[in-house]
């Protein structure tokens, strides 16, 4: 059996990706039995995909908050502790779901199809309490690997529109990716999800953010200058048009662009960037030193992007059959 742990911050598109991956494999690789496992007890009541194994049958974050009178973080820790005691239930349900999916593939193929190894997609919770405050996720990973002989890969999603918003947010995304990589100790793939939400200009500029390991040498200072230029321009417009109701005169745009170009040349990053620039630069030097971070763009509606990501995952886990 092979599988992927779909993780990332809340709102990064994990659940949407899981459903998109299931639909993609059902069309382009119908001989691969796919089992979906939801491990997030805080997922919404109306689930966007048919879930083979759902941890909410064991514990629900909302019910824990109501019955135990705990806050959100305390409820997550309570859920994690209960999930750890029900590892056997999860393994049993996964085994039953695998048997069902294998039968479905054989029946659909008329009995003449040789199924590929089962494939497990795990929708992981995004809250940090499940990783730093509890051993439940690591216990489950080891149980899947040992008891089901499941070869796993971490697919770490971050929102492209958020991560490429500014340099400091991008640095945070890189640190989060490295932390997850070290914590899971599994083959690892980083993904910029929601790539389709970027504008054409942002999408072209976003190509630079995909290459984290070469970001320092090629794009760091250039993008910092661009960020500072945009900040200065916004401040200037705020002074000229304080109410926001006035429109920038089109005749002013060429002179504004020329002034922006002059400002780029005049920007002293050490002085104008301040402590944030120096701190971000120091952190990115650490990221660059690892030489392990890069991102794949993903639009779940794009066949090419889904195919490329699926091939990368299969290469990581050795799923070549």
Q: Could you say what each language-model-derived stretch is?
A:
Residues 17-21, 136-140, 173-180, 308-312:
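Alpha-helical scaffold elements adjacent to nucleotide-binding pockets in ATP/GTP-utilizing enzyme cores
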Residues 41-44, 126-128, 160-164, 194-199, ...:
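Conserved nucleotide-binding/hydrolysis micro-motifs of P-loop NTPases
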Residues 94, 99, 103-104, 114-116, ...:
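Conserved C-terminal guanine-recognition region of P-loop GTPase G domains, centered on the G4
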Residues 6-7, 38, 121-124, 155-161, ...:
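Conserved beta-strand segments of the P-loop GTPase G domain that flank and frequently precede/overlap
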Residues 184, 196-321:
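Canonical P-loop GTPase G-domain recognition
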Residues 51, 75, 79-86, 90-93, ...:
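Helical mechanochemical/support elements of P-loop NTPase systems and associated helical scaffolds
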Residues 1-7, 12-139, 145-151:
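Nucleotide-state-sensitive switch-loop elements of NTP-binding domains
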